[in-house]
C-alpha cells in the first residue's frame, strides 16, 4: 500500500544536483562527527548472512528477508540483512573491541515486506548501524539517556553546518530533547493509536526520546510497537523522534537500545513464543557469556538528510522504487524523486 502527503505550496529550494551535493556533505560530515563523539570506529559490514547463523534481524517477526543460494548451494540459504543489530554484537567480540570502544557501519538493506510506502518509508533502508561495549553495571536508564543526549547534540550540530551552507533549505531543530515512556503516553492518551500519541507528544515537545518499546502496555496489553526479542532490552530502549512541520507528524530518525543480557534474552523470547531461537549460534554465544554487553542502534541516513534539508519525501534523498501513481503525483507537486 502506498500513501502520499503533499505539503501545500511545496518548494524543494534546491535542484536535484544541489540536493545530491548536500546529501554527500551530510553523510560524510555526520559519520565523522558521530564516530568521534561516540568513540566508534568504522568497519566493513556484510550485505547478507547465513540463515542458519541467527544473525539476521527478525524485525517484527513476520517480515521475510530477500534470500538466495549460491551456485553450489553448499552454504545453505543466504539472506539480505534487514539490519545488523545482532551481527554488530558478534563483531565487537570478533574484532577485539574493549570497554568504551565501539563500531559503526554503512548498512544497506532491502525490506520487501514494508507494509506502507509513504513519505518516510521505502523498501530500501540505509543507516549507520552502531554498537559499543559497556559493562554489565552500565545497563541502566542513565547510560541510555546519556547516549541519546550525545546523539541528539551531534544531530543538532549538523543543523548548524547545513544552515551555513544551505540557509534556504535547512530545517530548524529544537534546542532540547525530552524523555518519555510509552506507558506515560498510553496513560495520557489511552484512546489514541501509538502513532497518534507520538504525533501529539512530538508536536508538544519538538524532540522526544520515546522509551520502553516492545513489551505489553498496562492498559491495552499490547506493545507500543513491535521489537525483536533477541537484541533490544524492551525496558532499556527507545526511538528518537522529531516533530516534522512539513508533514505535520512525528519523524523517527533513530532507534537504539541497551542490548539483552542472558536473562532478558530468555525472558523476552519466552514472551514472544520464540524460544526455538535459543539453539542458534548467536543466541548460544550470548547465553554462554561469549559476547560483550553492549548498547547500539541505527541512525537513518536518508532520514537524517531528509530532516536536515526539509524535504517532503524520502525519495528526494535516496534512489528507490515507487508506484507509478506516487511518481506522477510527486512530479506534479515539485517533489523531485531521485
Curated annotation (Swiss-Prot):
Where it sits in the cell: the answer is:
Cytoplasm
UniProt xrefs under PROSITE patterns:
AA_TRNA_LIGASE_II
- Record keywords: Amino-acid biosynthesis, Asparagine biosynthesis, ATP-binding, Cytoplasm, Ligase, Nucleotide-binding
Q: Which residues form the signal peptide?
A: none
The EC number(s) attached to this protein equal 6.3.1.1
* Biological processes per GO annotation: L-asparagine biosynthetic process
Record's GO cellular component terms? cytosol
A Gene Ontology molecular function term of the record: aspartate-ammonia ligase activity
- According to its UniProt record, which reaction does this protein catalyse? L-aspartate + NH4(+) + ATP = L-asparagine + AMP + diphosphate + H(+)
PANTHER family (UniProt xref): ASPARTATE--AMMONIA LIGASE
Q: Which family does it belong to?
A: Belongs to the class-II aminoacyl-tRNA synthetase family. AsnA subfamily.
Designated name of the protein: Aspartate--ammonia ligase
Amino acid at each position: 500500500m502506498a500513501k502520499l502527503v503533499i505539503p501545500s505550496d511545496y518548494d524543494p529550494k534546491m535542484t536535484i544536483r544541489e540536493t545530491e551535493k548536500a546529501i554527500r556533505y551530510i553523510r560524510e560530515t555526520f559519520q565523522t562527527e558521530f564516530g568521534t563523539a561516540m568513540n566508534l570506529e568504522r568497519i566493513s559490514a556484510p550485505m547478507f548472512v547465513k540463515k542458519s547463523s541467527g544473525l539476521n534481524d527478525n524485525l517484527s517477526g513476520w517480515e521475510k528477508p530477500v534470500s538466495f543460494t549460491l551456485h553450489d548451494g553448499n552454504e545453505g540459504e543466504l539472506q539480505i540483512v534487514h539490519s545488523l543489530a545482532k551481527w554488530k554484537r558478534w563483531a565487537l567480540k570478533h574484532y577485539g573491541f574493549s570497554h568504551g570502544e565501539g563500531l559503526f557501519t554503512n548498512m544497506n538493506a532491502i525490506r520487501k515486506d514494508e507494509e506502507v510506502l509513504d513519505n518516510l518509508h521505502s523498501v530500501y533502508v540505509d543507516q549507520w548501524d552502531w554498537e559499543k561495549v559497556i559493562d554489565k553495571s552500565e545497563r541502566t536508564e542513565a547510560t541510555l539517556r546519556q547516549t541519546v543526549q550525545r546523539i541528539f547534540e551531534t544531530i543538532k550540530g549538523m543543523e548548524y553546518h547545513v544552515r551555513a551552507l544551505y540557509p534556504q533549505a535547512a530545517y530548524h531543530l529544537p534546542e532540547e530533547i525530552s524523555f518519555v515512556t510509552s506507558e506515560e503516553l498510553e496513560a495520557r492518551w489511552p484512546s489514541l493509536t501509538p502513532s497518534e500519541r507520538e504525533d501529539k507528544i512530538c508536536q508538544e515537545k519538538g524532540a522526544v526520546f520515546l522509551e520502553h518499546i516492545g513489551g505489553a502496555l498496562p492498559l491495552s496489553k499490547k506493545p507500543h510497537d513491535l521489537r525483536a526479542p533477541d537484541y533490544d532490552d524492551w525496558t532499556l530502549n527507545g526511538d528518537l523522534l522529531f516533530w516534522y512541520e512539513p508533514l505535520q507528524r512525528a519523524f523517527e530518525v533513530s532507534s537504539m537500545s541497551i542490548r539483552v543480557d542472558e536473562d532478558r534474552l530468555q525472558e523476552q523470547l519466552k514472551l514472544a513464543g520464540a524460544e526455538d531461537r535459543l539453539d542458534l549460534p548467536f543466541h548460544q554465544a550470548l547465553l554462554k557469556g561469549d559476547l560483550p554487553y553492549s548498547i547500539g542502534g541505527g541512525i537513518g541516513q536518508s532520514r537524517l538528510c531528509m530532516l536536515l534539508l526539509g524535504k517532503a519525501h524520502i525519495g528526494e534523498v535516496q534512489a528507490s522504487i515507487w508506484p507509478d501513481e506516487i511518481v506522477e503525483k510527486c512530479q506534479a507537486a515539485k517533489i523531485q524523486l531521485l
